[in-house]
Amino acid sequence: MTKNKNNQTIWGTRISKGASTIFQKVGSSIDIDKRLYKEDIAGSIAHIEMLFRQKIVSFKIKNKIIYGLNKIEKEISNKKFEFNKKYEDIHMNIEKRLFQIIGEEAGYIHTARSRNDQVITDFKIWIKSATKEVNISLDKIIKNIIQLAEKNIYTIMPGFTHLKNAQAVSFAHYLMAYVEMFYRDKKRFT
């Protein structure tokens, strides 16, 4: 498990006995959350920028941390970063590497920010990005359905009510019902 500078695990500074292998496997999320590396780095850069603007860290420290974070992002993007399960999650893997690159100044990334803040920030940044991708896909689907509807204004199809035959309808009208549903879905994402 990850240890702090006093060589104690992050999760158990009051626990003298080490965690079991099973607990370590259950507690490690790096296999899942390593895909959040861009969000984690972006959140840390934004945080250190805020600390600089609030005059909590110097220009030199800010730049040193940003340099280290950018280097880590390149390493991960180029598949030269070795994720380690013993560091539990994406945050600790990045933090450990940042300490290796820039030294003790890496500790400033936690000034005025808890690990829970870091986790939720990463997740919100990821959700925003994923939502944007969904909206782009919905726009493409809507566009294609509208084009198909325009070609089928005079195409008649059987209508159904509760899976029983109902009044005949235009295929275009039927398709436009889906366009409205997708517009509703899009509103829910924004």
Question: Residues of each region from the PLM?
Answer:
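A helix-coil-helix interface module used to build multimeric assemblies
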Residues: 2-190
